[in-house]
Amino acid sequence: ECATLEDVDYLIDAANHYFPNNMISRDDVISTWAGLRPLIQPEADMGDMAESQVSREHQIHIGEDGLVTIAGGKLTTYRKMAKECVDTAVQILKLMGQLPEDLVSGQTYKNPLPGAIGWPEDDDHEAVAKQISEECECEMSDATRLHLVDTYGMRALELSRICAGDPSALEPIVPGRIEIMAQVDFGVREEFAASVADILVRRTQIFFRDEDQGLTAAHAVADRMAPLLGWSDEDRQRSIEAYEAEVALSRRWREEL
């Protein structure tokens, strides 16, 4: 799936309607993406019903063989969906006698997200950045410290320790941008990044923010990832080419101009 020229123009028109002082044009578009929303087909005939009227709610179905299936829903309700799905599976396993009756239901709503443990109650980002400066001896700029804090919360301390042990980790992923190579290391070691696209699209969002979409950095990122993942030269090249293809797909709408 990829965005079309019609999609791009629709979003530009919507943005300019709500923010008329900005007057965005096609030239301002760096990247695009498209996907399918997993809506549940209404039981009744949709008739003239617009897609926007279809329910975004999720449903859980239990098959005759005990398979628990969840469908529909939204990204913003991911935790609630996961909890309800797991709780349903737990109840089934209890009925089958495979789990103790006193097993409690999920408590994920009480668990802080990664990086939130130890976060100051007054939400003072600069205090955490100062803590990094005091605890880790590395030549890191104030802007980089704040970037790491804004991105990783308290886990920014872990990235600063990577930099303290390896000065090359402070090098920018893309010259002139704020993201650093330590984020590549951290992405592989702690966030299951397994490809150049994982880093540039899904961990740093350079794909969406850099005018070149990080194409010039793809080789350096692959070089950084290769020893961490045990890549061969072929693996490295394959990951670079896959990223280049993803960038090309995000720009395909321009072929319609």
Question: For each of these PLM feature ranges, what is it?
Answer:
Residues 2-257:
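C-terminal accessory subdomains/tails of enzymes that are appended
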